[in-house]
């Protein structure tokens, strides 16, 4: 049987630790004026033998917490004038006042309103065993502020205790005996009013932000992020943000109903019933005053306002014929020339292919007259001196075509006579206008003209810029390379740089990279030499 010298060493260490700890606790209690008691179960430093204990044993952590609470309660009695919340842990049997503490003036607890501040006590604190009720004050000056009405359900006594406690805190903030964990959250009266004002300003800012968000949601369709880039001309942009035909019809209908000769039955009818004829619809749409009013009320984009000022469609002639709109509609249905400029014969699309029209087929060059002129052996009078691609003229012709009563039968029975030929023209001078020459235009006659189905225009929606760049790369005619200078958008920049310039940029970039690498290598070698030396 071998002898183990370490046997029982752990038990001896535990016993020594318990003895030392109990000695210290008894000395601490004797300093506080309390009766010394044995803390550890069945153990006393004076008597080493075991004895049964009636009280249940407590864990060291729980025992330490109890002692700390007692110590805090005793230390907080002389400082009762400050904002100490530790009175909620006290009872009358625990209050012990030493002789040196009797010299200090004690605060009358009936006048201290901090005990009514239930919402200022920490959440982990136990409920108070008693509460001092303050006397009711007749003065109404300490009523609750209006900003707190509806927020808390506290009585007037709570608000009186709040302001009294805040005043006591502001008075005694300079002469505090020790740090308290509630010092940081203490507020004086001006600070409280500043916080209330800040809350009001924050609520106002939130309200204004909410209004801005709703305004942005309403005007998201007019946002420039849904418009095509400036170098690409959209077939949908000229219909995108104008007032719909139903809104214009309501406006014109209200104007007719207010006239003295208007019939009372039309006031309750459909707004477009008073414009059932094609000629009346075109006259109402081409009223210049009406269009200017709607543009000033509804349009805010400067580009569209410049387009209004630039178009020659707003003239004084309001009595246009339907055949002129049909002839101009035929010009809209011509296929746009490809970017190579080699297309000579452009034919009008038949009715069977209208449903398959894509954005490339509906593309219309706004500067058509400045690049091409129409030539034919048999000239006919167009009937108008000017031709415009403005959004209003396109809308008027579209509405006239869609509201025609005999559209389907007329559309299916007509045939195409002769294609129109386009040749390259010289650029216009400053004093010339972009108008169609009457002697060089041959359009189908009134009985043989062909209307286009514009229902696909209604289904087109605004396209984002990134999608437009992809479409322009796939369809070169969308980029309008024949009319515009080289563009600066990132999606089309690569296709407009010549080959020799691209090679030159590449060579320059390689040379600069080599120089930078050589300089970097020299610097690294110098640093290495300095480091080693």
Swiss-Prot record:
User: Where can this protein be found?
Assistant: Nucleus
Which residues lie in Low complexity bias regions? 476-490
Which GO BP annotation is one of this protein's?
Answer: mitotic sister chromatid segregation
**Which keywords does this chain's UniProt record carry?**
Nucleus, Phosphoprotein
What is the superkingdom listed in this entry's lineage? Answer: Eukaryota
Name the segments for region: Disordered. Answer: 30-92, 221-274, 475-510
Q: Which residues carry this modification: Phosphoserine?
A: 336
Compositional bias annotation for Basic and acidic residues: 498-510
**Any one GO CC term of the record:** condensed chromosome, centromeric region
The reply on keyword Phosphoprotein is yes
Where along the chain is composition biased (Polar residues)? 30-43, 79-91, 231-247, 254-263
State the Gene Ontology terms under molecular function.
protein-macromolecule adaptor activity
Q: What is this protein called?
A: Uncharacterized protein C2G2.14
Which species does the entry assign this protein to? Schizosaccharomyces pombe (strain 972 / ATCC 24843)
């Amino acid at each position: 049987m071998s002898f183990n010298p370490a046997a029982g060493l752990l038990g001896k260490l535990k016993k020594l630790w318990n003895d030392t700890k109990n000695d210290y606790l008894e000395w601490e209690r004797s300093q506080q004026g309390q009766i010394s008691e044995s803390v550890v179960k069945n153990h006393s430093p004076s008597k080493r033998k075991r004895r049964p204990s009636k009280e249940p044993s407590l864990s060291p952590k729980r025992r330490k917490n109890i002692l700390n609470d007692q110590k805090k309660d005793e230390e907080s009695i002389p400082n009762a004038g400050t904002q100490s919340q530790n009175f909620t842990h006290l009872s009358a049997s625990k209050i012990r006042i030493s002789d040196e503490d009797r010299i200090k003036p004690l605060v009358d607890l009936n006048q201290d309103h901090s005990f009514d501040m239930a919402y200022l006590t920490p959440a982990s604190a136990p409920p108070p065993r008693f509460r001092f009720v303050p006397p009711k004050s007749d003065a109404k000056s300490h009523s609750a502020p209006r900003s707190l009405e509806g927020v808390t359900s506290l009585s007037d006594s709570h608000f009186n205790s709040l302001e009294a406690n805040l005043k006591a805190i502001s008075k005694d903030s300079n002469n505090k005996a020790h740090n308290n964990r509630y010092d940081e959250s203490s507020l004086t009266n001006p600070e409280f009013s500043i916080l209330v004002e800040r809350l009001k300003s924050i609520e106002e800012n939130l309200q204004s932000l909410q209004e801005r968000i709703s305004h942005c949601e309403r005007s998201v369709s007019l946002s420039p992020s849904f418009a095509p880039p400036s170098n690409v001309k959209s077939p949908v942009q000229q219909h995108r943000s104008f007032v719909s035909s139903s809104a214009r019809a309501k406006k014109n209908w209200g104007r007719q109903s207010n006239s003295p000769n208007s019939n009372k039955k039309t006031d309750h009818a459909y707004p477009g019933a008073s414009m059932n004829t094609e000629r009346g619809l075109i006259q109402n749409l081409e009223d210049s005053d009406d269009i200017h009013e709607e543009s000033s009320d509804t349009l805010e984009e400067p580009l569209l306002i410049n387009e209004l000022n630039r178009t020659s469609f707003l003239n004084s002639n309001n009595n246009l014929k339907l055949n002129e709109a049909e002839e101009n509609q035929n010009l809209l249905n011509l296929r746009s020339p490809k970017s190579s400029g080699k297309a000579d014969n452009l034919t009008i699309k038949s009715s069977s292919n209208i449903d398959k029209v894509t954005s490339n087929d509906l593309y219309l060059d706004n500067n058509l007259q400045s690049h091409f002129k129409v030539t034919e052996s048999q000239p006919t009078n167009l009937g108008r001196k000017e031709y415009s691609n403005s959004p209003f003229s396109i809308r008027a012709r579209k509405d006239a075509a869609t509201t025609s009563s005999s559209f389907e039968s007329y559309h299916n029975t007509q045939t195409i006579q002769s294609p129109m030929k386009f040749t390259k023209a010289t650029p216009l001078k400053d004093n010339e206008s972009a108008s169609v020459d009457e002697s060089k235009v041959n359009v189908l006659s009134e009985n043989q003209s062909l209307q286009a189905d514009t229902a696909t225009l209604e289904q087109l929606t605004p396209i984002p810029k990134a999608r437009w760049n992809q479409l322009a790369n796939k369809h070169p005619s969308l980029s309008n390379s024949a009319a515009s200078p080289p563009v600066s958008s990132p999606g089309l920049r690569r296709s407009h740089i010549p080959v020799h310039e691209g090679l030159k940029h590449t060579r320059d970039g390689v040379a600069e990279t080599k120089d930078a690498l050589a300089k970097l290598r020299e610097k690294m070698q110098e640093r290495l030499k300095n480091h080693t030396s």
